[in-house]
Each structure stands twice: as C-alpha cells, then as structure tokens.
Design a protein with these regions (language model features):
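Alpha-helical recognition/docking segments in bacterial nutrient-uptake
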Residues: 1, 61, 65-176, 235-245, ...
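N-terminal helix-turn-helix DNA-binding module of bacterial transcription factors
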Residues: 1-64
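Alpha-helical structural signal in soluble globular domains
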Residues: 43, 92, 96, 201-213, ...
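Residue-level detector of anion-binding/catalytic polar loops
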Residues: 50, 99-103, 147, 184, ...
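Hinge/beta->alpha junction and helix N-cap segments in small-molecule ligand-binding domains
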Residues: 76-87, 103-114, 163-173, 189-211, ...
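Periplasmic-binding protein-like
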Residues: 121-130, 187-190, 222, 243-253, ...
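Flexible loop/turn connectors
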Residues: 237-340
Length: 340
C-alpha cells in the first residue's frame, strides 16, 4: 500500500500542498484560519500521514533533535550503558525533551572523531556533553554556534551552560565519614585521574579530609583505572591480597564500589568487618549491594532534566548550576571505635 504524501493530505483537506506544509511545520501565516488548520490536521490523522523529518528540517532549519555525547573512555567497550548513572541521566533527559517536542540522539565519539564532528554530521539543534575535559573539543563545539550544555565537564572554554555537583565536597564528606568512624588507612579507588574532572576533584576532597586528620595520601592506596564493575572486582581482589590492607576505601562511583565488594568477598574479605567501603552516586546498585552501600548521593535525574531545560531555553546567557551532595548511611562502613 502506497504511503500517503503531502498531495494526498491536500486533496483530502481541499487545500493546496503549500497550506499543508505550513500547518505541518507550524509556520505562522495570517491567511490560515483555525478551520483550515483543523481540516488539514484531521486529514493527516485520517490518512495516517507521517511527515518526513528530513524535509521538515530543511523547511525550518531545525531538526528538533538534541544530542547527548558521552565519552567512550574504554576502547571497544559498551561503556555508556554499563553504568547506571547514564541510564538515570538519560531517562530524565529523554522524558523532558519529549514533553517539549524534541527527540534525543545518544552517541559516543569514536577514536579520531571529535564531538563537534558528531554534532555537525547529525544536524543537532543542541548538544549535551557528559564528562568532557578537553579544551580543544570545547573550542570546536563553540564554533558550531549551537546551544551546548556541559555536564560533569571541566574545560576552560567559556560561553557554555554547565551542570555539575560539588565533587570536591562529596569526596571530602566521604573520606571524613570514614575517618570519623575511626578508620585511618584509607584507599581511593577511581577512574582515570587527569589534572581536572570529577575524579580529580573527588580526589582533592579525599586529600583535604586526610590532611584535616593529620594524614597524607599514600601513593600505594591511590588506585585509578576503569569505571566499571569488572575493574571494581579486580581492585577488590588486589586489595584483598595486600599484606597491609586499608581499613577503609572511598570509591568514586557506585558501580566500582559494588564490584569492589564482590572482589573482596570472593577472596574471603568481609565488608564492613574487615574493610569499610563508601561509594558515590547513590544509584540503584547501592541499595542492591550486599551489604547495602553507604554512599554519597547526587541527583542524577535532576542533572538530566536541567540539562535539557537549559538547552531548549532561548536564553543563551551561560548558567553554571552546581547541585549539592548528601551522605546516605547504609551498611558498608563499620564504626571502628566500637572495636577499640
């Protein structure tokens, strides 16, 4: 059966093809009466006509398509959906976009490809970039002259909306909590640490808390690698095998922390009796963990919602939104004072 086209809609409504195009693209026209618009819309429904998105993009110079670009930090891995953080973020972003008449495209950037190239080739109306710290990438995105919102991204380029949590404070709160429980040999397990970014800022908070208690970070207890469940398991097995194990671990992401707990348990090390663990995110995993994970809560869904709102808002004045973090106590940290 032939797919209905503009001509079919025009004939059914008794109007010109141009009139149908005006109605579909919501083009202002004083000559179109409410009755005419209703006839066209009724004809569209009766025929089951589906507008051609590419044609609408050409007509309006607008795709109603927003991009969410997520770094593929681990080559060859399905990284972006292995971490519940991204599922929570995307669910909120997609819902907010859809309610406003937009669609969302999710993409990573392949090796040798820039975020700007991805945005340009997809004809995006705006871009949300998660976890980017490359100044040159920021400059290239700025040259596209489309709205950009940086989420958990720390680059020097100005002129963008940005959203983050107080990462340094979160790292400080987590480490201080362990210290206040009487733990003193505290490791930091995280993703790759550069000279900026969430992992670095959380490390700064970790360092600050240690210094307040007269301690210095031990190089051997700084374990950086992938942010994945599998890497967390490996780190748990590694810590279990140390002659002098830490008595507490601050982990920069819940997915890592849950893996860490599994790795420790498989080697006969108990959480929290032998090693206390605190995570960061407060994802669903933290509640499903055994024992339930004490963690730093950040509202990931709010990040996704706010990112889309900033993107579709016509106000281009850059806004910097910093969300607070809170401590969620569960069962993965013991009070060492009780064992003195």
């Amino acid at each position: 059966m032939k797919r209905p086209g503009l001509k079919d809609v025009a004939e059914r409504a008794g109007v010109s093809i141009a009139t149908v195009s005006y109605v579909i693209n919501n083009t202002p026209s004083q000559s179109l009466s409410p009755e005419t618009i209703k006839r066209v819309n009724d004809a569209i429904k009766e025929l089951g006509y589906i507008p051609n998105q590419a044609a609408r993009t050409l007509a309006n110079n607008k795709s109603n398509l927003l991009g969410v670009l997520i770094p593929q930090t681990e080559s060859g891995k399905e990284f972006m959906f292995s971490n519940p953080f991204y599922g929570d973020f995307m669910s909120a972003a997609e819902y907010t976009a859809r309610k406003s008449g937009y669609h969302i495209m999710i993409s990573g950037a392949d090796s040798g490809q820039t975020y700007a190239e991805v945005a340009r080739t997809r004809g995006l109306d705006g871009v949300i970039v998660v976890g980017m710290n490359d100044d040159e990438e920021c400059r290239q995105l700025k040259a596209l002259n489309i709205p950009v919102v940086l989420v958990d991204s720390y680059c020097e380029a100005s002129g963008f909306h940005s959203i983050c949590v107080d990462d340094k404070q979160g790292g400080y709160m987590a480490t201080k909590y362990l210290l206040e429980k009487g733990l003193r040999k505290i490791a930091y397990v995280t993703g790759q640490i550069n000279d900026k970014g969430v992992n670095y800022l959380r490390y700064q908070g970790y360092e600050k808390a240690l210094e307040e208690f007269g301690l210095s970070p031990e190089k051997s207890l700084l374990l950086a690698g992938e942010v994945s469940f599998e890497h967390g398991c490996k780190m748990g097995e590694y810590l279990a095998g140390l002659t002098e194990r830490p008595d507490g671990v601050f982990v920069s992401a819940d997915i890592l922390a849950v893996g860490l707990c599994v790795g420790l348990r498989e080697k006969g090390v108990r959480v929290p009796e032998d090693i206390s663990i605190i995570g960061f995110d407060d994802s669903l995993l933290s509640r499903a963990c055994d024992p339930p994970l004490t963690t730093i809560h950040q509202d990931v869904a709010d990040k996704g919602t706010e990112a889309v709102k900033l993107l579709i808002n016509e106000d281009r004045t850059p806004q910097n939104k910093v969300f607070p973090v809170t401590l969620v106590e569960r069962g993965s940290v013991r009070d060492n004072h009780s064992f003195d």
